[in-house]
Each structure stands twice: as C-alpha cells, then as structure tokens.
Amino acid sequence: MRVKREHLTVLLNRLYDRGDGSFTIEHPSDEIGELVRVTLASHDSCTVRFSTGMDEYAAARQQVSLEYGDHVADDLPEAAEFRNAVIASGIIDFDNRDEIETFLDRYGDPDLMAGHPPVFAGFDTNLMPWRIDRVLGLNEPGSGVGYVNGFVLATGVRDELDWDYKCHNTDPFISAFGRSYEEYWNQPLGSARIGRLGLLTYRRIRDIEQAVEVQSDQGDEAIINAYDTYDQNQRSDIILFSNDRNFVERARAHRLLGQHVAFPNTYPRKSTATWRELELLVYMLAVVFGVIEVPSVTIHGVWRGKDQLDWQHERVKLDARSPKIEPKLEGDLSIVESYDELN
C-alpha cells in the first residue's frame, strides 16, 4: 500500500497498539542492520536511540563494498548523508545552531514598515535535500511569517540536483540484501535519490513559498554571481546558507551575507522526538536507504512504478510481512484518507 508521509502515523499507531511501542528501524542487510531504536510515548516525548555511530556505520558500509562491490555499496548513503537525513527530520540539530540564530536575529526579520529592504534566503546545493528552509525555521509554512520575506533560487542549484541514475539490473541488490530489492527496477539509485529529495525542496520553495528564480550556470562561482546580480538589481538583502565554508567565503567576497551551516560529527546517545518528527525520520530513511524495515512491515522509499506524483506527495510503499497487520493498516489508512478528503 502507498502511504503519504504525513499518514505514517497510521503505521506508528498500529505498531504501538500491537505491543511494539519500542522498535528498531533496520536496513535489510546483515552488514548494516539496526539504524535507530524508537520508543513511542506521548505526542512530543518519544525517544530515539542511535544504535550505530557514524564511524561504525561507515565501517559497515565499507564491508558491504568488500563483499558485494562498490555498485551495491554506493546505493547506501554515506555516513554524513545518513546523519543529514536525521537532521532533516528535526530530531538532532546543527552543530552551530546558536551562531545561525545570532546571524538570523541580526540580518533577518526586517521592519518593512520602517523602510528596511526585504530579506531573501538562498542556498547552496549541498543543503537542498535536507528540508533546509524548514529545519532552519526561516518562516512559518502557510503564513510566511519569520526571518525572511522570501527566497531566491539559482537555477544552477536545480541543475546540479537534476540527474538520474536508475537501476536496470536488480540482481546484485537482491543477492546482497534480499527479495525486497526486486522493487528497485527503473528507480533512482543512491545519490540520485538524494538529488531527487533536493529537487522536491527546490520545487516546493519555488512553487509554494514566496520565491524568485534567477538564471545561472552550475558551479559555486556561477551560482554566487547570479545571487549577486539579483542583489545589486533589487532593493533587497540576500542571506546565503551553505555547508561549504569555501562557498560562504566566496559569497562574502561578493559582499553577500553568508552563513556556514555545520553538521555534527557524532550522534547523541539519544534524542527526544515528536510523532511528526518520527514520520519525517521514517520517510527520510526510507528514501535515502531505498528500503528499511520495522516490525512486520517493509517500507520502500522507491518501488517499481513509483512516479512523479508519488515523489511530489512524499509517498512510501508499505509491504506487510504479517497477514494480521495488513488489513488493519489498510483499514486505518482508509479512515485517514477519507477524513482528508472531507476536509
């Protein structure tokens, strides 16, 4: 069954009701195995324990490469991408959140009534897959209230994300990880899935938020030049964010306001999460890993026949491994979807 990301509460509820209030999210392979352990509680006090450190995960990924080849291992996210997916859920934070908040307090939230120029945010390519506008809290979805008045998007960022590397031979993945990888046929592999996440963020900001698209070639210098040209031609201030210090320094050399976004190098032992953050975590891990498992259910981030609408609506595919849970999930999902249609 195909499920929108915001309806994954149905799965969490069903796990809780059947006695799996504490469960693991796992990769199907023996080499990778357990990723995180989740304990469900009230809506804002669930617990996520990080079973595998970044170095430990990197070593396990290397073992996959040794046993099955680089082609198979490259489908797994790098340790940094695994961490970034967790950050995108909001469960762990950036290393320099205080510095970012100070930057936003200083340069964001302009007083337009007093004649101050509006502030627009722009991003480097490396941040786009990770729901960066939402995680930074730049404005409130729907209301537009927040630190910035809108966004500037360089088309070079879009083009750096817009590439596809699809699976046309599922046999190596089935041999390494199991029969669930039959669903990989004609679906994006590895970094291409992460690029697709970035494109979704780009298009959401462009089409739904207050955004201006500026033409640019690919590459840091071309992207920064496009932001700089827009900044000079418009009465506005642009603030740029990147995980790359060189990008930030180049932006500052153009007299643009740049802020480095630092990711942590380790996981905390555990973290508190809301149910909504757990929905995001399950969705992000399903996409970056391709396939994950929870008790009695396999969750596919990609599957044979997944199309653009499935990506746009952030759908995953649930395959019940237990005949008891499948009709209950289908019934719960039908109720939730009917409620959405009525509202």
Where are these regions (language model features)?
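Feature 3881 marks metal-assisted phosphotransfer/nuclease machinery
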Residues: 1-123, 127-239, 246-343
